[in-house]
């Protein structure tokens, strides 16, 4: 008999060799019906996996991220099977699950069209209805290569040949289709209830522009049609809110072919950016942070010392200065560490909180670039805190509360993930355990719910990630808290303790916005360009009905500017309805309309973007109203 520990801590005994699917049935027939995959001792596996030793077990459903992943991974295989049935000459490349669904890359001597996608989708529905079992099998290297050669799958042969010696080579078979794959997958094609093919794109083999251009088909999959319909509605809404479209319409930013991935901020975009950064500075000053600034370019040796060279070299830009090798920083932490090292520190100085709005550069593949969301140059709102081990819990709690304050201001709900040690980590087991427990205890102490994301920590320490949920249900990973014992060791950081001896500080890396540019992109989509008054680039649009009101309009404009209200005037010889419609398209919070009545009464006719016509009020009353709205940062 073997002992199986369930997620809730309950221990059950079973015969050795029992399949996970059978355990799911014994736990609950309802769970068995919903089960898609499982985790055994933290590793995601198929439900058909047999258990031969004591293990911890978590049954995964579509509510779990890895459950979704398994279902959508199978969706990619179903797509490939459908394409091969309809177009046997097509060659298969790769087909993974991704955050929002899946894709598969194909080599074909024709171009896929939207009409062909409809035909493929119909074939997918047939395959789902046929309910083929997914059967995993393994082959020795030579047999695996021969199998793929027989099928004329050159890309699969290349993948197998590139696998390290001794690597397990596994395949999945479903009906008449077999694919090279490590898995895991759901038990049968019938589990994938609803599939939709979404779009077509080009993609270089292995992401290398020197390789052949393939055709990529994107799709998504759900266990219920209602969930798929909801997702498709969200996509339609997302198109309307696309920050690239709104950024152009509202004249906030642009991206040019002279600098792909390097955004240009226009005056209105800079207003939003400066407000966000100034608010950030104010709140950090209140919370005891001191702001620093470090150079963009630093000697290559620094990046070797920090470990970024080994883990991040492919994403870095390099230059040569005075015959020396330098790198443009992809992260702010090594520069911040040099600031810490510049002075001797006492335990009385700790915790030391150093903040930086630092510009970083990271090389992203051109195909991955996406407006402000994925760029090559961005401002990271970093802070690095140095503390004793005894101060970890209190400092982490303080950071969590600060992050919570920021996100609530913008109306975001969010969830928290604790990410643990990855495979390519550095440091001792003991340090990782202390660091992970420190983050866990901080979250537990304030009753903050969180998920555990095994193996997704930074290479130097575990982390807490904050995922924002926007108004149409999408999630965005922004804030992060990373506990680090490794950098202080690598850079020989120290402080003088109460005993007069040198001690090693603990370092925490953290961000709130994550990337200022990306956060602005998220806000554009969150508000659909209709920013709250305190954040709007133009807060008031002032317009006259005829030239007779021009002098009064200029007086009103001057009064608004004296009160630091951002105002634009529209004195064009156009109908007032046209001016109002244009201001509404520009999503200005307030329009002040001035006609003869308003001039005579010394008032302004107020129209709100949100509430429509508010009637005529005195200018003083309006100024008081909008100033209060700005002060309290009404969302």
Curated annotation (Swiss-Prot):
Q: Which GO terms describe its cellular component?
A: cytoplasm
Q: What protein name is recorded for this chain? A: Threonine--tRNA ligase
On whether tRNA-binding is a keyword of this UniProt record, the answer is yes
Q: What detail does the entry give on cofactor binding?
A: Binds 1 zinc ion per subunit.
Q: Which InterPro entries match?
A: aa-tRNA-synt_IIb, aa-tRNA-synth_II, aa-tRNA-synth_II/BPL/LPL, Anticodon-bd, Anticodon-bd_dom_sf, Beta-grasp_dom_sf, TGS, TGS-like
Function comment: Catalyzes the attachment of threonine to tRNA(Thr) in a two-step reaction: L-threonine is first activated by ATP to form Thr-AMP and then transferred to the acceptor end of tRNA(Thr). Also edits incorrectly charged L-seryl-tRNA(Thr).
List UniProt keywords, sorted A-Z. Answer: Aminoacyl-tRNA synthetase, ATP-binding, Cytoplasm, Ligase, Metal-binding, Nucleotide-binding, Protein biosynthesis, RNA-binding, tRNA-binding, Zinc
Cellular localisation: Cytoplasm
